[in-house]
A protein has these predicted regions:
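N-terminal accessory scaffold of Fe(II)-dependent oxygenases
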Residues: 2-412, 420-437
């Protein structure tokens, strides 16, 4: 359950919060790197040890075609390193290949974390993804869980920081590794036996929903027609809560804390630490979903943790099978593939400061306690604290006409583009947002 307060927005070009890091050197030249782009002799095929590694290697092109298009942004020395690692892979020299991968990943990581994320050349993201692919293969030494878990983390890092290569092979590799890890464990998600009681307590003690005055309540409609929604809400830019439009989604019956852990518990995700992203102590950390649930939901760490504005459904397609694209998105100008689907998963008490989004937004509550968190950090975020406004510093805020609502399970809130809104989580929540044009 969540409380949402909003008001019409102003003109501007909102941007998402971005990663920033230290300065870095420039790049020179470009090439196509890989064992197939030179005359050096390489071992045909690949020398694999074990069925898991063979299954992963089978997802990649043949050795002669295993090459990466780098472009002019990437240093020639990096292209040579890519080629070297590829040749070591082809020869089955796993330890040496792993060493080359680590050097390659360190170099690419520095470039990925230099300056704003939007300015990072996609070629460097491909290099990073390539390094993660080879690293995952190198790590699959034994049949146990530990090696596969480490390899799975490498795949997730490539999915989080890299770009799609070889037909988005990292998603397929991660699926195989995840299935292997789960088959070895042969038990529910980590900590579920001890954490279930705590999780149930967290769900059974929600904060009472605040009463919303009728004159400021967001209107509610049950399954309006496309034409009615377009004429009365989309075109005028009016918020509305749509009821009954997602009741058929599998997640409405299947999803629970335990289910999320079972399907995604061993996957590495970015977690925001801090109650709101405008706080000075706010930060981001990488951890598995199981660790996130244990630390921030079950045991309720002092620092609030939030899996916010993350494209989890691209990373874990198994979860995407449990949701759908709202029919009303067909009224937009873009294609379905251009819709950005974000997951928002966290405990009671997280706050999304007053902000606006760059596109139309549908926000869906997925289970008995779900909520969103819109994490933009720059000029699309207001300086005003909605709950404790400084009216001496911002006197005109007292004149703002606002709407409010409390989202219940299965509700879908339409938030028009650039419409200012503020969100507070009233309970443990998992929500899905759809940004569309």
């Amino acid at each position: 359950m969540e409380q949402v307060v909003g008001s019409p927005g102003a003109e501007g070009t909102p941007t998402q919060h971005e990663r920033h890091a230290c300065d870095g050197a420039g790049a020179d030249g470009g090439c196509i790197a890989g064992a197939g782009c030179a005359a050096e002799a390489t071992t045909p095929g690949v020398v694999a040890s074990g069925p898991l590694r063979e299954a992963l290697r089978a997802l990649l092109p043949p050795q002669a075609e295993l090459r990466l298009e780098l472009g002019e942004a990437v240093d020639r020395s990096v292209g040579m390193l890519v080629q070297q690692a590829t040749e070591l892979l082809g020869g089955g020299r796993w330890d040496q290949c792993l060493q080359s991968c680590e050097v390659l990943l360190d170099y690419a990581w520095e470039r990925l974390n230099t300056g704003p994320w939007r300015d990072v050349d996609k070629a460097w993201r491909r290099v990073y993804a390539f390094g993660c692919v080879l690293k995952a293969l190198c790590l699959c030494e034994g049949p146990g869980e530990a090696a596969a878990t480490t390899a799975l983390r490498a795949c997730d890092m490539g999915l989080l920081m890299g770009a799609a290569i070889f037909g988005n092979v990292l998603v397929k590799m991660a699926a195989i590794l995840q299935a292997h890890v789960l088959s070895v464990k042969k038990r529910p998600a980590q900590g579920s036996s001890e954490e279930q009681p705590g999780a149930k307590r967290a769900r059974s003690e929600p904060v009472p929903a605040p009463k919303v005055p009728l004159d400021s309540a967001v209107p509610r409609l049950h399954c309006p027609s496309l034409q009615h929604f377009r004429e009365h809400f989309l075109l005028p830019g009016r918020p509305v809560i749509l009821e009954g439009v997602v009741d058929h989604w599998p997640c409405m019956k299947k999803w629970s804390l335990e289910y999320i852990q079972e399907v995604a518990g061993c996957r590495t995700v970015p977690v925001e630490v801090g109650s709101r992203y405008t706080d000075d102590e706010w930060s981001q950390r990488l951890m598995t979903v199981n660790d996130f649930v244990s630390k921030h939901i079950v045991n309720k760490a002092k620092d609030v943790g939030y899996l916010a504005q993350h494209q989890l459904f691209d990373q874990i397609p198994e979860l995407k099978q449990d949701i759908g694209i709202p029919d009303y998105c067909c009224l937009g100008r873009g294609e379905e593939e251009e819709i950005t689907i974000n997951a928002w998963f966290g405990p009671q008490g997280t706050v999304s400061p007053l902000h606006q989004d760059p596109q139309q937004n549908f926000l869906v509550q997925e289970s008995e306690a779900l909520y969103p968190h819109e994490t933009h950090l720059l000029h699309n975020t207001s300086q005003v604290d909605v709950e404790n406004p400084d009216l001496e510093k911002f006197p005109r805020f007292a004149e703002v006409q606002s709407l409010a609502c409390v989202l219940e399970p299965g509700d879908m809130l339409f938030i028009p583009v650039k419409h200012w809104h503020y969100v507070r989580a009233l309970d443990l929540s998992f929500s899905v947002s759809f940004w569309w044009t």
